[in-house]
């Protein structure tokens, strides 16, 4: 070794570091480029991983001092003027709330006569702000139409006695409780007629029937068969309906404006697996006015259609599935207000907000 020079072992030569430096450079520079660069947008657009649940957090809603007025807000709607409507089932009333969220005004009150409510079960609003309420004074199903101020416009009774085919939380579901208000008419689920959907004019005259009942395997038990064909008709923005079955196998159908079946889809997902596993093979019975009826608990709690025609279905478990116009599931969602919500109603307001009860919350980014 010459004087004035030091010896450098071979493992300190530059080539020695190549196996260590290259992976570091790839991880530090190349991989982030794949994820963030516009050149690789295909990677960003990959569908959500199976089992992923998106959490939507409330961005607004009615203030607590307003919500505390209501006993059981079962529906929360907003019309183009910004006014909110709250349907309070336990108070047998409908309230209007200014867009500022100020004190509510009771615009429809309790009572059995025309223009009042007794044992109400459902509520729906047309785009022009007129609304329909279903109730059952003295056990007879009735539908009433009101203007945005609560003034009575029309109403009629349906023949026969009200029958609860499905119940959850003390609320009976079926018949008038499945009302969809069309503005110039009303759509109901009445499986006892042999069809899934019956449209009525505002005078109470049947206009047309849509959809055949589904096979349930319980055709020999008429009441159970009808319960498994209980569901909600949901008008589609382009015409026709979605129909969501509330009990039994979770299924929905899509009908066009002429009433023709376009498709049927079975709703599946890991969030539903525990519910389906616990579904009874034999349903318990109960006696009402001397007649026996099956005690059926729903799988689906509520459903709604957004302005783009996507179907949102909320289950008894605190999860909601979203399906596109072709019936394909695109999202699994949970709602968070003060805590995780199990929606009892969903609606889409005129300002791009999703309105949810309980809690009268608003969500953005749907």
Regions found by a protein language model. Give the residues of each.
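Bacterial N-terminal signal peptides
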Residues: 19, 23-40
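Eukaryotic scaffold repeat domains enriched in small/polar residues
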Residues: 45-366
């Amino acid at each position: 070794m010459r004087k004035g020079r030091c010896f450098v072992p071979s493992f300190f030569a530059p080539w020695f570091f190549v196996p260590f430096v290259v992976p570091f450079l790839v991880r530090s520079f190349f991989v982030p480029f794949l994820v963030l660069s516009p050149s690789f947008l295909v990677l960003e657009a990959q569908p959500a991983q199976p089992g992923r649940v998106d959490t939507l957090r409330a961005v607004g809603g009615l203030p607590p001092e307003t919500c505390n007025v209501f006993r059981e807000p079962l529906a929360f709607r907003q019309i183009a003027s910004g006014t909110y409507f709250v349907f309070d089932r336990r108070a047998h009333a409908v309230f209007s709330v200014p867009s500022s969220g100020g004190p509510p005004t009771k615009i429809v009150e309790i009572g059995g006569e025309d223009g009042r409510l007794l044992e109400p079960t459902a509520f729906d609003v047309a785009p022009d702000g007129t609304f329909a309420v279903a109730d059952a004074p003295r056990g007879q199903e009735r539908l009433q139409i009101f203007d945005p101020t609560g003034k009575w416009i029309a109403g009629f009774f349906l023949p026969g006695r009200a029958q609860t085919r499905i119940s959850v939380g003390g609320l009976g579901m079926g018949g008038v409780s499945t009302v969809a208000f069309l503005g110039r008419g009303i759509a109901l689920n009445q499986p006892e007629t042999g069809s899934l959907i019956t449209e009525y004019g505002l005078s109470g005259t049947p206009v047309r029937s849509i959809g055949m009942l589904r096979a349930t395997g319980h055709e020999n038990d008429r009441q159970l068969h009808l319960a498994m064909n209980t569901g909600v008709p949901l008008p589609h923005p382009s015409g026709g309906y979605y129909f969501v079955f509330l009990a039994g196998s979770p299924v929905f159908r899509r009908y066009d404006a002429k009433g023709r079946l376009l498709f049927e889809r079975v709703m599946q997902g890991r969030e539903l697996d525990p519910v389906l596993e616990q579904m009874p093979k034999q349903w318990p019975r109960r006696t009402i006015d001397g007649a026996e009826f099956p005690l059926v608990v729903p799988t689906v709690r509520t459903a709604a259609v957004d302005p783009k025609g996507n179907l949102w279905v909320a289950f008894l478990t605190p999860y909601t599935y979203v399906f596109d116009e072709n019936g394909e599931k695109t999202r699994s969602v949970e709602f968070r207000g003060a805590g995780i919500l199990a929606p009892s109603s969903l609606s889409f307001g005129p300002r791009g907000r999703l309105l949810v009860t309980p809690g009268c919350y608003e969500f953005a980014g749907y």
